[in-house]
Amino acid sequence: MKIDSNGIVNPHSITNEIPSYDEKQAVDLNGNAFAPNGTFQKKDLISHKNDFERTMRHDVLHTNPKIEVRSETHIYEPNDSLFKENQDFPSNPTAHSPSSSSNDSVITATGVPDGILRDSPIVSALEPPSSNSSSSPQLQNLKHQLSSPQPSRAPIDRSSSNPVTSSQQPPNDRSTLSSSQKAKRPLKRSYSEKNSSNAEPSGSRSGDRGTNVSTSGSLLDGIPPDIGSASWAEAVKQKRVNMRRRREELDDECVLVGTRVSEGHENYVTAYNMLTGIRVGVSRCQAKMDRELTPADFTARHKFTFDITGNELTPSAKYDFKFKDYAPWVFRHLRQLFHLDAADYLVSLTSKYILSELDSPGKSGSFFYFSRDYRFIIKTIHHSEHKFLREILYDYYEHVKNNPNTLISQFYGLHRVKLPFGRKIHFVVMNNLFPPHRDIHQTFDLKGSTLGRELDENQPCQSPMCTMKDTNWIRRNMHLQFGPLKRQIFLTQVKADIDMLSSLGIMDYSLLVGIHDLSRGNRDKIRNSILSVYDPNVSQHRVPSINGNESHSNVHVIRQVVNSTGPVSLDQSCNLLPTDQFVERRNFMFYSDDGGFQATDENNEPGNFIFYIGIIDLLTKYSYVKRVEHLWKGINHSDSVISAVPPAEYASRFYKFVESSIKPTLLVLKPFPLKPQDGQRVNKQQSVNAGNVRTNNKHGSLNNNTAPSSRNAKSTSAHKSPKTEHRFPFPCRNVTTNTSSS
């Protein structure tokens, strides 16, 4: 057995014949001579063979780092996946099989020992000669690789049973190879080429696992493919996590209605000061132990001064301003009566410092800001309305305490903010009557009077969100579809509420009615599908708060419910209603049916509509101005048709109008013409009265830049409830609002 110039010995050449060596080669790996005459003795053959295997194993481990060594048999075996992806040798039908008595090396069908990589330089010495070896391109490539200078060998550590320690193994990174080494490495074949070759099948050996390795060199998610497989997978995973986090942050900054008020908006400073004052004022009050209210609490005023430096009483702020919190203890108890958790309240308003604003103020000059989750409204009010609310605060608190199912607006806070060299801005925080997860297909604002209480139907509406009034209600033969049981409950509560308002000298309030058609659900996509919405079934996401009340699910909104509600039959519609509502809604009778009050027939069976009802505009006193208006309009018109009448007369007329509007018969919705936008033609069958409340001239306006869609009324009738006739679709997308009192 002779050793060639490269120091490689073919184990198949070892036979019983003892080959001769010169004196320089007649030494073992430790430098000891095998025989004085330079020849091997037969008794030394086995030990020399073991030394050769260790040497060859060391070569392979340094040349191909991805090799596993099994200590049980002391035979190195390559990683399965790497072994398969480096099958660059064609099958050799003339390969010689090893002797059955040899247990140290196993020869595969290609003639290469099982433990050696196919692209290793040692393969050339172990591969038996074949007739077509000179013409094989793989062998030519291998010869070129063998002719290149090989890296120097590291000394073998014989003290350890493991031939190569982990510290001696080069790093498993393709990027550490030099450019010349990369160029000299044989190219890997594609998966199809491997399967088409006559190489050993991947499943022929026990324990093999197929691994698909991309060799195209293209970037995946911006990550280079020439890094380790584990690092590459981890980098891809981290990049996708970052992308998902960025999408969630963008979704959190979305608003459901109006224009987003953020940095750069002309009213951002005002909105920032409002939210900062609310956060500090409510947090200070909630941090104290609860106690009973005293008469002084109804007139209390807490002042805060904010600047960029801050002090021991107030934190630093981005702007200098003054903030005043009115009756904080009273509104704390009111929030508890409305089942609103303080932490949930603050998170909804101030977690992202994002509000949405109506595009233009109402006739009264008030501005409306909505929390980003559409649950709360911040409304600026006149100084006279601010004073009047403080005057009636005690009566309002007692009424809410004694009538937990009241229909009047829910006030959560009364505040004032003053900018340097600016005017004082009074504002109130209250509830939004309409839920964010339901489309409101038609909206009405009812007062019981008819003079000037009409939205002209002969002229198309500028926006698809139009709030109609009393005359439109009467002309369309609209009514509240309540059976005998719900009729009695509803009228009893309306009577109690208007009696309280009349006793306080309040008039000019109105009944806000939003109608949701269950047969249509949210299929019209009135809201933009990219905006966040609530999932009414939030019980599994809710966590208890410190004071024992259940808190809403992080105030984060879920989008899966908006488009999930499709047309269903009348007997199935009631079964699809979520059993759980918002914490502050589910405890009230008139908000118990998916945030509203579901229609019923004469047998008190559930109907096909949900009514969202509330009494708004509570801060209009029968003042001197209203008396003059009553005298002026009373010259040419009867008191029964004008709005400015004394509170007692107004309450009586209002109750009679509501009472006459309740019927158990089926309700039929009619369309309203829409003004064409952007050159689009709108036919008479298009619907415009869809979506949430479109604020009228009393409550402000909203103009979202979304074009309405149209659909044939005939296609809509195919999806209608079997007991309800729908004559038109509701394709509008803009969102409108409920602007409750003041």
Swiss-Prot record:
The UniProt record lists the PIPK domain at 264-662
Region of interest called Disordered, as start-end residue ranges on this chain: 1-21, 82-228, 677-742
Which PROSITE patterns does this UniProt record tie to the protein?
A: PIPK
Q: Which UniProt keywords apply?
A: ATP-binding, Cell cycle, Cell division, Cell membrane, Kinase, Membrane, Nucleotide-binding, Phosphoprotein, Transferase
Reaction(s) catalysed by this chain, per the record, are: a 1,2-diacyl-sn-glycero-3-phospho-(1D-myo-inositol 4-phosphate) + ATP = a 1,2-diacyl-sn-glycero-3-phospho-(1D-myo-inositol-4,5-bisphosphate) + ADP + H(+)
Protein name from the UniProt record: Phosphatidylinositol 4-phosphate 5-kinase its3
Q: Can you summarize the PTM annotation of this record?
A: Phosphorylated by casein kinase I. Phosphorylation inactivates the enzyme.
Q: What does the entry list under GO cellular component?
A: cell division site; plasma membrane
Record's function text: Catalyzes the phosphorylation of phosphatidylinositol 4-phosphate on the fifth hydroxyl of the myo-inositol ring, to form phosphatidylinositol 4,5-bisphosphate. Involved, together with the calcineurin ppb1, in cytokinesis.
Annotated compartments: Cell membrane
Principal subcellular localisation of the protein: membrane
The Gene Ontology biological process terms listed for this entry are: 1-phosphatidyl-1D-myo-inositol 4,5-bisphosphate biosynthetic process; cell division; dynein-driven meiotic oscillatory nuclear movement; phosphatidylinositol phosphate biosynthetic process; regulation of mitotic cytokinesis
A GO MF term: phospholipid binding
Query: Bias category Low complexity: which stretches?
Result: 90-105, 129-142
Q: Where is the composition biased (Polar residues)?
A: 158-181, 193-218, 680-719
**UniProt-listed Pfam families:** PIP5K
What is the membrane topology here? Peripheral membrane protein
